[in-house]
A protein has these predicted regions:
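Transmembrane helices and adjacent periplasmic/lumenal helix-loop junctions
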Residues: 272, 276-300, 321, 416-422
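Membrane-interface transmembrane helices that cradle and orient dolichyl/undecaprenyl
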Residues: 259-273
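Primarily membrane-embedded glycan-assembly and transfer machineries that use lipid-linked glycans
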Residues: 2-96, 105-263, 299-420, 433-434, ...
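A periodicity- and composition-biased signal for non-globular, repetitive helical segments
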Residues: 211, 291, 422-425, 452-455
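Generic transmembrane alpha-helix motif of multi-pass integral membrane proteins
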Residues: 261-263, 278, 294, 411-412, ...
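Transmembrane alpha-helices of multi-pass inner-membrane enzymes
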Residues: 423-441
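Short, intrinsically disordered terminal tails adjacent to the first/last structured region
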Residues: 1-11, 440-472
């Protein structure tokens, strides 16, 4: 019996997808779960729904469990490939299920183990200081307080930095992070909402893991061949950077997902929704601001003046709804924590220009002055303007994501801090450019077919008219 092509992937498309999934497994597996924080914690007590995981690892961090799950993901991929080789096709529903299983097996086990270990010891163990602080910020919001300008020196967070749960006066006085909360308001607001989830799943990393996995179905919002969309979506959700971010505790995934949704809504001409999604992305992470001019140009190319005004009002309204409560509470603390802290107060970290200058002796102190503002004005801003101009000239939406990838990478490089986890942003933007390219190619193909069909019908009608006149 013949199989309709819209119900199954052909052999080549299916094997391309499965090859991409296999590559993700192979890239992730050797380093999965490596280089955690060096906690000197007591063995975790098995508690609650995650007790089996804690028992399986003897109450400690065990990368072998994560790698076993990744190996299982590889086996699932291999079995699916064998089925394709035998049958010559892969049902579309089966392709979605296989991709989802592989992504889940790569992303979720590490997060669940970390949360189980944390619940069996103390909140300052088996977590990252940033997500621990986000959890605390969510509690403050639920209690009607602002997390900006708050003194975290006696919140429990101070016990994280010794890695054994102890605390010293020096830590409380010297650790700058205990006096600042660096995230835009969307993060504490989302943490406040997520904190209502029953324990132990109220850990913010569970939310991060879920939205990380959600990048896979988000890729299906774009148009194009299913196999290619699933491959790019799986890379968005389960790249080594995204997988590590989920269990280690860096909270970029919610903002990245919102940005992916924003671009998907642009290509679907849901312009008001795209503007709202961009605003949500910015509320969740400052880095999304860099995408604003690129997405604005993409919106302007598709919108009437009235629709563009409506999108602008929606964007401003969503931002205002997120920022205003904290501006009213303490505008100075909000600015000091989210803008000044990252640009001028935080110590120099990482492999960017600041780190290179520090190692070369040009900068003497990690806390010393660094001309970030001048570099941003002289280097990053002109480059971004050129990229936006190139996007405007090209008329193709995928160049917006490509331009954003280049712009944000340069911004990271010239900043005081260049964490490797930041690379998830240019990587996601590059994959997003691929999804946008597929969407535009599919759209142009449909337009060409429609034009050809219209011309054919018009030609046939014209010929019939001549024939009728000839008979007359």
């Amino acid at each position: 019996m013949a199989i309709r092509s819209d119900r199954a992937l052909g052999r080549a498309e299916a094997l391309l997808l499965l090859g991409a999934l296999g590559a993700l497994v192979a890239i992730n597996l050797p380093e999965l779960g490596s280089d955690p924080w060096p906690f000197r914690a007591p063995p975790a007590e098995p508690r609650g729904l995650l007790a089996p995981l804690v028992r399986a690892t003897g109450g400690g961090w065990e990368p072998g469990l994560l790698r076993a799950a990744a190996t299982l993901a590889g086996v699932v991929t291999a079995l699916a490939a064998a089925a394709v080789l035998v049958a010559g096709r892969l049902w579309r529903s089966a392709a979605v299920v296989v991709a989802a299983v592989v992504v889940a097996l790569l992303v979720l086990p590490g997060v669940l183990l970390q949360v189980g270990l944390r619940g069996g010891t103390a909140p300052w163990f088996h977590d990252n200081d940033s997500t621990y602080q986000i959890d605390i910020a969510g509690e403050l919001v639920r209690d009607g307080e602002t997390p900006y300008g708050y003194d975290y020196r006696f919140s429990g967070l101070e016990r994280f930095y010794s890695f054994d749960g102890s605390v010293s006066r020096q830590t409380r006085n010297a650790q700058v992070a205990l006096r600042h909360f660096a995230y835009f308001p969307g993060t504490p607001l989302s943490a406040a909402a997520w904190g209502a989830v029953p324990q132990p799943f109220d850990d913010y990393r569970i939310l991060v893991a879920l939205v990380t996995v959600a990048a896979l179905p988000a890729a299906l919002l774009f148009r194009g061949p299913l196999g290619a969309r699933l491959a790019l979506g799986a890379a968005l959700a389960a790249s080594p950077l995204a997988v590590r971010a989920a269990w280690f505790g860096t909270a970029d995934a919610p903002a990245v997902l919102a940005l992916v949704v924003a671009f998907a809504l642009v290509v679907r001409s849901r312009l008001t929704g795209a503007a709202a999604a961009l605003a949500v992305a910015i509320l969740l992470k400052q880095f999304a601001v860099v995408a604003a001019p690129f997405l604005a140009v993409a919106l302007a190319r598709r919108a009437s003046p009235r629709a563009l005004r409506r999108a602008g009002v929606t964007f401003a309204a969503v931002l205002a709804a997120g920022f205003l409560p904290f501006v009213i509470a303490d505008a100075g603390a909000l600015i000091a924590d989210t803008v000044v802290y990252g640009g001028a107060t935080y110590r120099i970290i990482g492999y960017g220009l600041a780190g290179v200058l520090l190692e070369a002796g040009v900068i003497e102190d990690r806390f010393g002055p660094y001309p970030f503002t001048a570099l941003a004005l002289l280097v990053w801003l002109p480059l971004t303007a050129l990229l936006v101009r190139a996007q405007t000239r090209s008329g193709e939406t995928w160049t917006a994501a490509a331009g954003f990838a280049a712009s944000v990478l340069v911004l990271f490089f010239i900043g005081r801090v260049f964490q490797t986890s930041y690379l998830v942003w240019p990587l996601a933007a590059a994959l997003l450019a691929g999804l946008l390219f597929l969407s535009e190619r599919r759209g142009s193909g449909r337009s060409a077919r429609a034009t050809t069909a219209s011309a054919t019908v018009s030609g046939a009608t014209h010929a019939d008219g001549h024939a009728a006149r000839g008979r007359a």
